[in-house]
């Protein structure tokens, strides 16, 4: 039997189902990696998407503020200390799925481009439960073209970055 994961929109989803992110990482690692995903939320952040996603010098303006707010909003619901596996004072990483479309698949210039980054690199300090959140990734909920859930592609891509994996395609624009 499959482990029950969550119920969304009246439909049950299973972590280990064929086509799941878990299955992708498990199969890609020949059974060496079996990730655990804890789903929390949804929460509503304080500003409109354009505050976080508007383009400034070809980059999103404030996605890190969205990530910090999301962490603060779920702080009472979860114990962030359990996500610091090496006890170095930092949450290993988090992944935020934001509502709506992403700029990478056709959303307008005020939406967020899915990415991975570090809060501290952006000058943002986020401490929850005595641990710092730094490394994160985020991606959109809906695909602009199909108007359906995005599936696992972008999630797996950005999640791979927080695991330390590089892009395997040209990233310099040449």
Protein language model annotation of sequence segments:
Residues 1-174:
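Active-site-proximal segment of zinc-dependent metalloprotease catalytic domains
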């Amino acid at each position: 039997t499959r482990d029950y994961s969550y119920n969304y929109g009246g439909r049950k989803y299973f972590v280990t189902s064929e086509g799941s992110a878990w299955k992708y990482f498990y199969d890609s690692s020949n059974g060496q990696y079996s990730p655990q995903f804890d789903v929390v939320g949804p929460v509503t952040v304080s500003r409109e998407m354009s505050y976080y996603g508007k383009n400034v010098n070809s980059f999103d303006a404030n996605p890190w503020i969205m990530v910090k707010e999301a962490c603060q909003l779920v702080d009472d619901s979860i114990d962030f200390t359990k996500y610091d596996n090496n006890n170095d004072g930092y949450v290993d990483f988090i992944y935020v799925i934001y509502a709506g479309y992403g700029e990478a698949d056709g959303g307008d210039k005020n939406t967020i481009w899915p990415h991975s980054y570090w809060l501290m690199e952006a000058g943002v300090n986020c401490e929850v439960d005595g641990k710092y959140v730094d490394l994160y990734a985020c991606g959109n909920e809906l695909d602009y073209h199909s108007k359906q859930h995005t599936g696992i592609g972008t999630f797996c891509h950005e999640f791979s970055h927080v695991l330390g994996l590089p892009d395997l395609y040209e990233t310099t624009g040449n």
